[in-house]
Structure formats: structure tokens, C-alpha cells
A protein has these predicted regions:
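Metal-associated gating/positioning segment near the N- to mid-region
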Residues: 46-111
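Short, surface-exposed connector motifs at secondary-structure boundaries
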Residues: 83-88, 112-116, 239-247
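N-terminal metal-binding scaffold of metallo-dependent hydrolase/deaminase domains
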Residues: 1-39
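Divalent metal-coordination and catalytic microenvironments
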Residues: 10, 28, 48, 59, ...
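Active-site loop-to-helix "anion-binding N-cap" substructures in soluble metabolic enzymes
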Residues: 91-109, 113, 122-126, 144-154
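Active-site mouth loops of central-metabolism enzymes
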Residues: 58-70, 91, 114-126, 167-170, ...
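Hydrophobic faces of well-ordered beta-strands that scaffold small-molecule active sites
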Residues: 54-60, 87-89, 116-120, 142-144, ...
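Histidine/acidic residue-rich metal-binding segments in metalloenzymes
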Residues: 126-144, 148-273
Length: 273
């Protein structure tokens, strides 16, 4: 049998240690680690080099400032250069998934240099009702932006394929939406990714900073207190326990938040971070 590619001579890092083997690749996958040198179309001499597993980046935003057919090429190319072999996109749609998901999937499939997956962001009750549709079309994780609502509800959605127009929306990810997303995700056996900030606290903090004419990173940080983060973590963790849902807290930004996560784990919440 002739394989696509054979990489010879490298030190291969595995979960159990470093081994010296040849690596056989076929149809884009590693199919065997061996001492043999089978027939191949391409042979790469990696003598003295180290082969490490590709990095999985589970949290990437692209398709917002350029349409996905352009963004996927540029961002996945950069990912590949940096050793990221799987990237997971936070898809944000301002309209129906039943209406727009198919085009996003089609244009994505023709544009990536590396493996990829998609998290579906849920902003409305109508989109909650489309979570089953997302799963049926291969999207099996969901994102909640607890930071978006009220005076801080503005967000840029992903562009439509073939268009190059920014799509600004105003959303309100309220307690009803959060509860229904967690409940539905649990019933589907899907995890929920969480941006954990309380938008009411953040909105109040930003308003106070503006009233005092404060600006810069320090003002930004003070307007989004760690208590906002820990409060959101506590709120959604209780829901996750009630419905037996798995949570993944993205980009935790404070010691207070991490302490709250540890406390929620002790309470039985299934959490990744």
C-alpha cells in the first residue's frame, strides 16, 4: 500500500512520553507510528526534530470583520503557522439559524487550512428553539454572553457570506434566555460556553466612569468588577446543577471568579475552564 506522506526520524511526543518512530499520514490523518518505511507519495526527513500534537484553540472569533470565506483562510493560515491544528469559532447570528446556518457551514467547509468546529451563540428565545436544528447539522455546543444586555447590549454579529458589511445588533441575554439555553443544552447533551459577567453591574460601572470623565484601561477594568464575574458564575452554575448541564467558562479574568468556580465544582457543578 502507498500512503500519502511519511515523516521519518523525529522524536514524537505522546501522552506517555517521547518515542522515536516514523509517522504515516494518509488522507489528512496520522494513521500509524512505526519503525517501518512504507511506500509513500511524499517523504519528509525530520531527523533531530520534535513532533508535538497540534494545539486545539476552543475559542476563536472570526467572520465578524470579514466574511467567513475570507476570514477562515487568513485566520486558519495563521493558526497553522503557529501549530494550531483545530480552531473553534464562536458563530454569532442576528437572525435565524434555520435560515443562515447552512451558508455559514458551506462557506466554512471550503475555506479552512486546519480542522475547525463551531459553537452557536444564542441571543434570543427563537434561537433557543433552533438549538435542536443546530445539533442536527453538526453544531453541538452553545455560547451564552451573560455580559450583553441593557446599556451594554451592543454586539457585532458575524457577516453574511459574500458580504463585507458590519452587522451591529442590540441584544438582551436575560435570565429567561439563560435558563432556557442551559435546560435545552442539557436535554441535548451539549455543553454551554459562558462569558460570565453581569451586564447590569457592568452597565452601571461604565455609566459611573463616563460621568466622572474617566478613560483608559484602568477605568475599563474598574467598571467591570470581579464581583460581576463571580455573581454570573454562581447564577449559571446553580442552573447547570438543576438541569445537569456541563459548563465551560471562557477567559476567566479574576481570582475571585476562579475561587467561585472552585466553590461551584465542590457543589457538584460540571465545569471546564
Amino acid at each position: 500500500m502507498t500512503y500519502d506522506t511519511l515523516i521519518v526520524g523525529s522524536h514524537i511526543i505522546t501522552p506517555t512520553g517521547i518515542i522515536d518512530k516514523n509517522m504515516i499520514l494518509d488522507e489528512g490523518k496520522i494513521v500509524k507510528l512505526t519503525n517501518e518505511t512504507p511506500s509513500c507519495d511524499h517523504r519528509i526527513n525530520a531527523e533531530g526534530l520534535v513532533s508535538i500534537p497540534g494545539v486545539i484553540d476552543p475559542h476563536v472569533h472570526y467572520g465578524v470583520y470579514s466574511p467567513i470565506e475570507q476570514a477562515a483562510q487568513s485566520e486558519s493560515h495563521a493558526a497553522a503557522i503557529g501549530g494550531v491544528t483545530t480552531m473553534m469559532r464562536m458563530l454569532r447570528l442576528g437572525d435565524s439559524y434555520e435560515k443562515s446556518l447552512s451558508d455559514q457551514l458551506t462557506y466554512s467547509s471550503n475555506s479552512h487550512y486546519v480542522d475547525y468546529a463551531i459553537h452557536a451563540s444564542i441571543f434570543t428565545l427563537d434561537q433557543v428553539n433552533e438549538m435542536q436544528f443546530c445539533v442536527e447539522n453538526g453544531v453541538t455546543s452553545f455560547k451564552l454572553y451573560m455580559n450583553l444586555g441593557g446599556e451594554v447590549g451592543h454586539v457585532y454579529m458575524d457577516m453574511k457570506p459574500g458580504e463585507n458589511v458590519l452587522r451591529e445588533e442590540c441584544v438582551e441575554v436575560n435570565s429567561e434566555i439563560i435558563t432556557k439555553v442551559v435546560q435545552k443544552a442539557a436535554s441535548l447533551g451539549c455543553p454551554v460556553l459562558v462569558h460570565a459577567e453581569d451586564y447590569e453591574q457592568c452597565g452601571c460601572g461604565i455609566k459611573k466612569s463616563k460621568e466622572k470623565n474617566l478613560d483608559g484601561l484602568s477605568a475599563w477594568s474598574k467598571s467591570r468588577p470581579s464581583e460581576s464575574e463571580s455573581h454570573s458564575i454562581k447564577t449559571i452554575s446553580k442552573l447547570a446543577r438543576d438541569f445537569n448541564c456541563v459548563l465551560y467558562f471562557a477567559h476567566i479574568g479574576s481570582r475571585t471568579a476562579l475561587q467561585q468556580i472552585n466553590e461551584e465544582r465542590k457543589n457538584g457543578t460540571k465545569i471546564f475552564t
